[in-house]
Regions:
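Long, mid-chain structured domain cores
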Residues: 58-160
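Alpha-solenoid helical repeat architecture
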Residues: 6-10, 46-51, 85-92, 125-132, ...
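Tandem amphipathic alpha-helical repeat scaffolds
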Residues: 14-24, 55-66, 91-106, 132-145, ...
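Amphipathic alpha-helical segments of tetratricopeptide repeats
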Residues: 35-42, 75-83, 115-126, 155-166, ...
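Loop-centered beta-sheet repeat module
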Residues: 151-221
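Flexible inter-repeat linkers and adjacent short helices
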Residues: 1-97, 269, 306-309, 314-317, ...
Length: 364
């Protein structure tokens, strides 16, 4: 009995150590520890709580090593467990569930689990865990189109990481998120400054994958200013080195579309649709499908059907910024076809969506 307890304590300690390396963004060290832990998998499976803890951290490892490959099914194994109430495991369950929902673009669900996780943070009384929570929540807020709140949480996370040795990569990741929110706020100079700071940090540690994630964001920064050629230069580097990076593929396709390069745009759209179908990413499936219709110069009525399907999803997830963007594109299309009643209808829908975006970001 005592031997088993000691063995469980050692495994628990090893699992804690594994998670700490993930918090530090140390991929190679985390991979080595994963292999060491997998040698003890038969012992881990004997204990329900250890098995749940391992499954949670295994999901977190997948987020660390290839977050873009996370699908709706990636949490199935964890969902098969009975999750205890009011413990560090219940915190990790809701926290990681929120991360999973964010990555799979189920933002309403993500919000619910972030709220539950925040109430359980007391069971993990670690300052660095708070920083990790703030960082992940800032990503959610960014995707949820609340850039000011995202900046607040990214700043809180960065402050804690800065005060602890060995978290330089996390500081770089915070700078990356600060830059992203600055783009939403059209503070382009500040965004570029934050992105360059993040790249400097990642290059210092030879973190090529992280540099690529910032290159993607730089592409978006330049795309937001209609600097299509410059945007494509950064985005093509990402899509060449990470062919499954569907977000970079979409941004690159959209910039080629702006330049009237129909064939290149079409090729990228088909690649993106295949990837998004495989991983079940609903949001980007809509983005690619709408861009495909625009690239094919679909008639207004056909475009209307496709955009309305997207708007139904965007409204459900309260992504009103996209509802506004696509309603305005549809209004412009109807206007060009001299259908002024429909044009007026969709310009008005875009205006309503803009108001909802403003209300969502307003002080509560």
């Amino acid at each position: 009995m005592n031997v088993q307890m000691k063995g469980n304590e050692l495994i628990t300690k090893l699992l804690h150590e594994w998670y700490q390396t993930m918090l530090q963004q140390h991929v190679s060290k985390a991979t080595n520890l994963k292999q060491e832990i997998e040698d003890k998998l038969s012992d881990i499976k004997k204990e329900e709580s250890l098995s749940l803890y391992y499954s949670l951290l295994d999901f977190r490892y997948k987020v660390l090593t290839d977050g873009l490959s996370i699908t709706k099914d990636s949490f199935n194994e964890i969902n098969s467990f009975d999750v205890p109430n009011n413990s560090f495991l219940s915190y990790y369950y809701h926290f990681f569930k929120a991360i999973h929902a964010t990555l799979t673009t189920n933002y309403t669900e993500a919000n619910e689990h972030f709220e539950k996780a925040e109430k359980l943070l007391m069971y993990v009384p670690d300052e660095l865990e708070k920083a990790e929570f703030y960082y992940r929540f800032c990503i959610f807020l960014y995707h949820f189109y609340q850039p000011i709140e995202s900046i607040q949480y990214a700043t809180k996370a960065k402050e804690i990481f800065t005060n602890n040795e060995g978290y330089e990569l996390r500081i770089g990741l915070c700078d990356n998120m600060l830059g992203a929110s600055c783009v939403y706020l059209k503070q382009f100079e500040q965004a570029e400054e934050k992105y360059n700071s993040a790249i400097d940090t990642f290059q210092k540690f030879n973190e090529k994958e992280l540099v690529l994630s910032v290159r993607n964001n730089l592409g978006w920064l330049y795309a937001s200013q209609n600097l299509s050629t410059l945007a494509i230069r950064h985005l093509s580097e990402v899509t060449e080195k990470k062919p499954s990076h569907f977000k970079a593929i979409f941004l690159q396709a959209r910039e080629h579309h702006k330049l009237g390069e129909i064939n290149i745009t079409s090729e990228l759209i088909e690649k993106g649709l295949i990837i998004c179908t495989e991983i079940g990413n609903t949001e980007y499936t809509h983005h690619f499908t709408i861009l495909k219709a625009l690239n094919n110069n679909a008639p207004a009525e056909e475009l209307e059907k496709i955009i309305l399907e997207g708007i139904t999803y965007f409204d459900k997830e309260t992504l009103y910024n996209y509802t506004q963007e696509y309603a305005e594109k549809l209004a412009t299309k109807f206007f060009k076809e001299s259908n002024h009643i429909k044009a007026s209808q969709y310009f008005n829908k875009g205006l309503e969506a803009r108001e909802k975006t403003f209300e969502k970001g307003a002080l509560k």
